[in-house]
Amino acid sequence: MSADEDNKEQVLKECEQAEEIMKDKQNQKLISEITKENIQLKEEIKKLEAELQETTRTSQINEDIPETKIKFTSVENPESDSEFSDISYSCQVSSKVPYELQKGQALITFEKEEVAQNVIRMEYHHVQVQNENVMLTANPVSLNSGVKFQVHVGVSKMKINVTDIPDELPESQMRDKLELSFSKSRNGGGEVEYVEYNKQTRSALITFVESGVADKILKMKDYPLYINQNCHRVTVYPYTETHLKKFQVFSGVSKRTVLLTGLKHLQTTDEEVVEDFISIHFQREKNGGGEVEVVKCSLGQPHTAYFEE
């Protein structure tokens, strides 16, 4: 009986071990499947996030615009539809004018122009810097030349640029192929008015008859071009025209900034401390000053300050 019971216990143990091994294998398989599903889900999430970003980039932003009174003046007849359908914007660009601040000098900028001019008229100023009494001389700041201009950019709603065109056909045939390809509505195209093709640069300018076609194509970033049963993806991007207007060169004297000299022989080398004492002195009306915007001094290496018109 004892031997039979031992055999039974041995068999039970082996069965339990076999079950545990099976369970481990099943668990490992389940973990592997879950891991695989997680990887797939992460990839799907990345794709959805990319699509969401693209949708956000291309979609319009709705924003409340304050009411504006508009006065009707006249009716204009545009020479072409593109005159009113194109997008245009402009910006003003002004260069910063550098000024080199030498050792022993300081620049002080006041809020009001008349304060700066008064400080210059007084010319000499006794300023207490820690335990030293310093005689500073106020001078106007003469600036080098700078430039300013307007940049006008127009984005066409009727034209698109095409690049990366394969060099597989003669010029006239490729021009016809481009016109045919971009006129296919199933690919987002429309009726083509004109194709300007450059074989050397492998690029083209496509002009459509109707506005709106260019927008649809540009959202795709590339476009299918079939040549000899082969599909090539050509790159598309907006056609823009840029013009510079009202280019001007300016120079002169800063109206609110004053050059102070006489700091060369100061014992202290802490520029921030000196700047604080100068600011405190020139903020007082009894010293001929007023509200100070900024002070910058040089006690060691020269500094470069930048002025805008």
From Swiss-Prot:
Tell me one GO biological process term. Answer: positive regulation of inflammatory response
UniProt modification remark: Ubiquitinated. 'Lys-63'-linked ubiquitination by TRIM21 promotes interaction with IFI35 and inhibits virus-triggered type I IFN-beta production.
Keyword entries, A-Z: Coiled coil, Cytoplasm, Immunity, Innate immunity, Isopeptide bond, Nucleus, Secreted, Ubl conjugation
Query: At what sequence positions does the UniProt record place the cross-link Glycyl lysine isopeptide (Lys-Gly) (interchain with G-Cter in ubiquitin)?
Result: K23
Q: Tell me yes or no: is rRNA processing among this UniProt entry's keywords.
A: no
Q: Which InterPro entries match?
A: Nmi/IFP35_dom (IPR009909), Nmi/IFP35_N (IPR009938), Nucleotide-bd_a/b_plait_sf (IPR012677)
Which comment does the entry carry about domains? The coiled-coil domain is necessary for interaction with TRIM21 and for TRIM21-mediated ubiquitination of NMI. The NID domains are necessary for the interaction with IFI35. The NID domain 1 is necessary and IRF7.
Q: What does this protein do?
A: Acts as a signaling pathway regulator involved in innate immune system response. In response to interleukin 2/IL2 and interferon IFN-gamma/IFNG, interacts with signal transducer and activator of transcription/STAT which activate the transcription of downstream genes involved in a multitude of signals for development and homeostasis. Enhances the recruitment of CBP/p300 coactivators to STAT1 and STAT5, resulting in increased STAT1- and STAT5-dependent transcription.
Name of protein? N-myc-interactor
**Taxonomic lineage of this organism?**
Eukaryota, Metazoa, Chordata, Craniata, Vertebrata
